[in-house]
Regions:
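Short, compositionally biased P/S/T/A/G/V-rich stretches that sit at domain boundaries
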Residues: 1-9
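C-terminal beta-sandwich/jelly-roll accessory domains of carbohydrate-active enzymes
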Residues: 21-136
Length: 136
């Protein structure tokens, strides 16, 4: 399950296409969103102040992610990244945070998984891996 491309649906909406055997979902139960903006998605470009992401949602067909920007980008070299930013270094800590609560992470996964054979109370999902994709 990796992004295969993107489409600009409007001057402020990017659709990242992600083929999956089941529909995509945003999981905020298994992944902590404390300190995590936009479910792990970021938008950057060459300007010093790229437009902020105003919302992130799963597309109506369940096979893509819709990223809405607050304003149309004015800079070149736009890029969407996912699961690449960790929480800031905690006060007094000497090691960057990691893991599903503080590390670089995202909340997108397949909507159905498989039951783990060694513990039938555990469901294993297909998680969207970290990526960066140029959108200009």
């Amino acid at each position: 399950m990796v992004p295969t491309g993107f489409v600009w649906n409007s001057p402020t909406q990017i659709q990242i296409n992600i083929p999956s055997y089941t529909n995509l979902t945003i999981d905020t139960t298994n992944i902590s969103t404390d300190g995590l903006a936009n479910y792990g998605f970021n938008y950057t470009d060459e300007t010093g102040a790229p437009p902020a992401i105003s919302s992130v949602a799963i597309s109506s067909d369940g096979k893509g992610v819709l990223i809405n920007l607050a304003t149309a980008p004015s800079g070149r070299f736009g890029r969407v990244s996912y699961a690449t930013v960790e929480n800031p270094l905690q006060s007094g800590a000497s090691v960057k945070p990691s893991g599903r609560t503080l590390g670089a992470r995202g909340c997108v996964r397949s909507s159905s998984g498989i039951t783990w054979v060694y513990d039938t109370s555990v469901t294993l999902y297909d998680w969207l891996p970290a990526f960066r994709i140029n959108v200009f």
